[in-house]
Swiss-Prot record:
Annotated protein name in UniProt: Protein OPG166
Keyword Zinc: no
Keywords: Glycoprotein, Host membrane, Membrane, Transmembrane, Transmembrane helix
Sites where a glycan is attached: 29, 58
An annotated Gene Ontology molecular function: thrombospondin receptor activity
Annotated gene: OPG166
Amino acid sequence: MLRVRILLIYLCTFVVITSTKTIEYTACNDTIIIPCTIDNPTKYIRWKLDNHNILTYNKTSKTIILSKWHTSAKLHSLSDNDVSLIIKYKDILPGTYTCEDNTGIKSTVKLVQRHTNWFNDHHTMLMFIFTGITLFLLFLEIAYTSISVVFSTNLGILQVFGCIIAMIELCGAFLFYPSMFTLRHIIGLLMMTLPSIFLIITKVFSFWLLCKLSCAVHLIIYYQLAGYILTVLGLGLSLKECVDGTLLLSGLGTIMVSEHFSLLFLVCFPSTQRDYY
């Protein structure tokens, strides 16, 4: 008799465990559907999160009582006995959700939040590539300027300024990787992108030291400024999870291309007013 009782307890426990479902959700989900089906529900249907009521539907009076913390909650389709809970992301909390009527619990669902990357892998890789190439071209510009003119205070300022920009963006890259949506990664992305405005200052310094400030240089500077504006706009649109980073990448790519043009102009159009060692 004792063995039979133990076996029954084991079977009941097994049934409860196997009837519990686990559903994962991410910040990319606008709404979450928690499934539950009740054949011919009688007096009421109730959804709970742990031991707190979320939604109670009275079949007799056709009324729904909602928790003040879950105002977006609603039932899927009462006519088809589908009483799945539909709830928006802003009201979702991880935990154990139970669906029951007056005869007892019908469904138990464990809701688990899964964290996703801020940007997809392709966009993240391009961000690092564009930033790395831009910094490399900046280094080449400063190096070319340094060997082309006699050392002066202005040249020293240019070199120090370039080193500071590189250090800030490299530190930002380390903070940003991997691209999760946390305060640390947001700060990292800001450090990677916002110092790009100072590249324009280094560019003006380089062309001024080499006596090459011309209309073409102004076009390059305006082009880079347009890239920076795109970057800032893309950054503003990216300060939330599950976004498309195309606009941000367009800005970073434009800045990288302008650095290419700057280096080509420095090398291919020598100034007759340069002072060599």
